[in-house]
Amino acid sequence: PYSILPLVIGIGFGLYRINFQSSLIKIFLSGWFLGFGWFSFGLYWIGSAFFMTDTYHVILMPVAIILLPSLLAVFWGSACVCAKLINRNTKFSILYIIVFLSLFEYLRAHLFTGFPWLMPSMIFASNVYLIQVFSFIGSFSTNIIVLTLSILPFIFFSNFKAKNVVSLILLIPIAILLFCGILRYSNKSFLKNTEQLVTIVQPNIKQKNKWILKNREQHLNNLIELSIKYRNSLNNKNRIIIWPETSFEGSIPKEKKLLSNISEKILKNKNTTLILGLLRTYENKVFNSLVFLNSKGDIIHIYDKTKLV
């Protein structure tokens, strides 16, 4: 999340050191500690969620920010062990480590409901040119590209006899791929729709205040005011108005009447749609939902968030 591309060298250094370990236990622990460091520094922000309410949940924060990286790091440790089991030759096993680590990142994204956050490939997401690689080979295969780039400097400066040939073989296809990404972005074309306007409303309401019922009317008035601001100067353009996730205290279907009143105030144009986040209750279950509201106050679509990512 820091968008500092040179930091990827840190992964390469860790993988390079693991490559020369002989004991499977040491290899697993080294891979685990590398993964723990990666996920700890990248997922530190999860702890901030425990400060949203003044309850006992804050004491669980250390457990969350330590336990989650610890579990995710098992994938990295296991990948390193599998790579070493396939090839005991320390000179070449680093390439196997890269392949298996990329494979285990795919498994991490799908096993146990999946948690694909903070893959090494996400480093490319902070640059408009580098992220184009995703369109060619996808985010999972891009893990191989990022990990290979991270170890190239260490291969080049090592005592490995064929280091120049290996470095060149690895670098050429990556360079071609990156060049194609630059060309793709440089030759991009945009689809324009001058008849439709998207309005994103962010009232900047603190989470701990959002759930106070007595403040709901004030929060709603703020959302409505921001939604209709400059409406008269928009020449009756068709609009899509987007409110935040869990926009206000309340849930559907209990708040259908309230939603109808909101649509009367905001959706004057029949082709305008309000998209808002709202809780939905059904058979004693609570869903974090995306609600589409038309100008008549009718709910035309509902999408329930069933997975974290």
Residue ranges and their predicted role:
Residues 1-187:
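Membrane-embedded alpha-helical bundles of multi-pass enzymes
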Residues 182-309:
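Soluble catalytic regions of membrane-associated enzymes that act on cell-envelope
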